[in-house]
């Protein structure tokens, strides 16, 4: 079948076509194997967990070790799922409120590239106060694009508009932080950061840019280990660490990375060298 999701026509099978028991039969695979060929060795080894299973795993680990692991949850295509009568927001909040771990203990971040559902989260969290540590994060896509809900509502506001000082001030009325695409902070020359972080911090928004990856293909030209096209998939930890450090120095409050082990090392090294916290 063919469906239009956020303005893009897609042909295939969709999650709403299956039951949970059917989805449980699927195995996870590397999303972009041409760019991360080493990861295909893990294909078909792991089932796709439900949110409840992830919470229960984190809670079990917390009770055993005392180590707290937060949950950073993105609501994917909320306008589309609302149109399918499969709204995500209330089931998500109900699931999080079900467990003492997510209700009272762990830090929770709720993020979306759309705006309307984040405002709904804000209203519900303010009204019910069931999730004591929940925060709301506005994600930013490419600058010329508009949030899918704005497109559906004929609202002519782009992500670039939302990234101005006034735009960030507006976002701060419903969100606790922002998750910008990396180029909002540095362009490919990596000469100096933009005013994005400064303007976000001025209205008390945390800044968590995405996505940090150590393969050459995802690094700026001056950070690659080898600039030859055939080395696009080469892992380049030195370049990735330089990139981490530049964003840390620019003042980010957190990062999204596909290599959490490398990211953790980079954070620890930066904090040790600068005797500070993030």
Q: Which sequence ranges carry the predicted segments?
A:
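C-terminal active-site rim and adjoining tail of enzyme catalytic domains
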Residues: 81-82, 124, 128-278
């Amino acid at each position: 079948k063919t469906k239009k999701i956020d303005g893009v026509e897609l042909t295939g099978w969709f999650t709403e076509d299956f039951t949970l028991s059917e989805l449980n039969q699927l195995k996870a695979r590397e999303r972009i194997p041409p760019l991360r060929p080493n990861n295909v060795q893990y294909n078909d080894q792991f089932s796709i967990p439900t949110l409840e299973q992830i919470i229960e795993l984190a809670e079990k680990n917390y009770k055993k070790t005392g180590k707290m692991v937060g949950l950073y949850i993105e609501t994917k295509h909320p306008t589309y799922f609302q149109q399918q009568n499969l709204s995500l927001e209330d089931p998500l909040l109900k699931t999080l409120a079900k467990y003492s771990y997510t209700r009272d203990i762990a830090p929770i971040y709720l993020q979306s590239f759309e705006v309307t559902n984040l405002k709904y989260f804000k209203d519900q969290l303010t009204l019910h106060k069931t999730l004591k540590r929940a925060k709301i994060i506005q994600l930013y896509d490419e600058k010329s694009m508009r949030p899918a809900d704005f497109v559906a509502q004929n609202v002519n506001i782009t992500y670039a508009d939302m990234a101005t000082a006034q735009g960030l001030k507006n976002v701060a009325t419903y969100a606790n932080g922002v998750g910008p695409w990396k180029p909002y902070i540095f362009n490919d020359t990596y000469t100096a950061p933009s005013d994005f972080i400064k303007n976000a911090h001025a209205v008390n928004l945390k800044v968590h840019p995405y996505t940090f990856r150590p393969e050459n293909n995802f690094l700026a030209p001056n950070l690659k280990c080898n600039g030859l096209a055939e080395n696009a998939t080469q892992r380049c930890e030195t370049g990735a660490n330089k990139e981490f450090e530049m964003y840390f120095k620019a003042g980010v409050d957190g990062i999204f990375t596909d290599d959490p082990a490398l990211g953790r090392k980079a954070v620890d090294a930066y904090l040790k060298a600068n005797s500070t916290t993030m």
